[in-house]
Amino acid sequence: MALLELSNISYVVKEKSIIRDVSLSVHDGEYLTIVGPSGSGKSTLLKLCSDLISPTSGVITYNGRDLATIDPESYRKEVGYCFQRPYLFAKTVRRNILFPYDIRGMEPDMIRIKYLFDLL
């Protein structure tokens, strides 16, 4: 079971689709890197996952429970987020993707990372 799962999430503001039909699963111990151009919805996606805003449609679950049914205060004690500021992490995309491995002294899965770079 996924720790955090987004199923067909959309977020619309004033008839403008900010996030459209996004689905993803994050399992315990996994790292997730979200990259994209300015205005592509990265911050909105993090706000949705952090329960700071609610999706227009779709379902977000945490430990198998619909996020809409979980007390926001207790959820926020378990889940946090950090927005990247260019001056704080002024590194290449490669260095930012490797950052979680570096700080834990772990060997990165280079096959997976190469796959991610090929998507860019």
Feature map (PLM): residue ranges:
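Helix-to-loop junction immediately C-terminal to a conserved catalytic motif
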Residues: 50
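Conserved ABC transporter NBD signature motif
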Residues: 58-66, 75
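Conserved catalytic motifs of ABC-family nucleotide-binding domains
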Residues: 86-95
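Short beta-strand immediately N-terminal to the Walker A/P-loop
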Residues: 32-33, 81
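ABC-type ATPase nucleotide-binding domains, specifically the catalytic core motifs of the NBD
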Residues: 95-110, 119
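The feature captures the beta-strand-to-loop junction immediately N-terminal to the Walker
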Residues: 35-37
